[in-house]
C-alpha cells in the first residue's frame, strides 16, 4: 500500500506533536507501507539558515526508501493573519495539483490528511473526488480561533 500525505508542515518545522507523526510514519514504514509527502519548504520554528538549506532540498528519502518527501516553494509563514491565510490557500492549491497530477501521487492508494490548517480537509476532499481514492482525515488540534 502507498499512502499520500499532503501536509502543511513537515520536519524540521516546529508544529504541534511532531513525535506523533514521526511515530506513525515509522510504524507505517515498519509495516511495509510506502509513503509520499508533498509539503512546503519549512518555515515554522526554524532559522533562516535552515530555510535556505531546505530551498535546495526538493526531494528527501526516509525510512530506507519507504518515504519520499517532495517540497515546493511557498512564502514563509508570517504573523499577519491575512498573509497566513494567503499562504495556506496557496499551499492547498499547490497540493491539490500535486495530489491530483504528480506521478508519485497518482500511484498512491489512500490519502492521510491532517486537520490543520482547516482548509486542508476541503482540498483533500477535492483530490479524493477527482482521484477516487480513500481519504483518512486526522481530526485534531482544532480550536474555535482556528476557524
Q: Could you say what each language-model-derived stretch is?
A:
Residues 37-102:
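A conserved catalytic-core segment of Leloir-type glycosyltransferases
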Residues 12, 43, 77, 144-145:
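Active-site loop signature of alpha/beta-hydrolase-fold enzymes
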Residues 15-16, 47-48, 81, 122-124, ...:
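Short glycine-/acidic-enriched loop or helix-start segments at secondary-structure transitions
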Residues 1-63:
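N-terminal subdomain of nucleotide-sugar transferases
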Residues 85-100, 110-131, 137-140, 144:
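An aromatic- and histidine-rich active-site surface loop
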Residues 53, 146-147:
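Short glycine/proline- and charge-enriched loop/turn segments
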Amino acid at each position: 500500500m502507498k499512502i499520500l500525505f499532503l501536509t502543511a508542515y513537515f520536519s524540521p518545522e516546529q508544529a504541534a506533536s511532531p513525535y506523533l507523526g514521526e511515530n506513525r510514519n515509522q510504524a507505517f514504514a515498519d509495516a511495509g507501507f510506502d509513503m509520499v509527502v508533498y509539503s512546503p519548504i519549512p518555515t515554522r520554528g526554524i532559522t533562516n539558515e535552515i530555510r535556505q538549506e531546505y530551498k535546495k532540498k526538493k526531494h528527501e528519502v526516509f525510512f530506507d526508501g519507504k518515504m519520499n518527501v517532495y517540497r515546493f516553494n511557498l512564502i514563509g509563514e508570517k504573523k499577519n493573519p491575512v498573509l497566513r491565510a494567503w499562504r495556506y490557500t496557496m499551499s492547498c492549491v499547490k497540493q491539490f495539483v500535486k495530489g491530483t497530477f504528480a506521478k508519485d501521487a497518482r500511484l498512491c492508494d489512500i490519502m492521510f490528511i491532517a486537520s490543520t490548517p482547516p482548509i486542508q480537509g476541503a482540498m483533500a476532499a477535492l483530490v479524493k473526488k477527482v482521484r477516487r481514492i480513500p481519504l483518512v482525515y486526522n481530526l485534531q488540534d482544532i480550536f474555535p480561533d482556528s476557524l
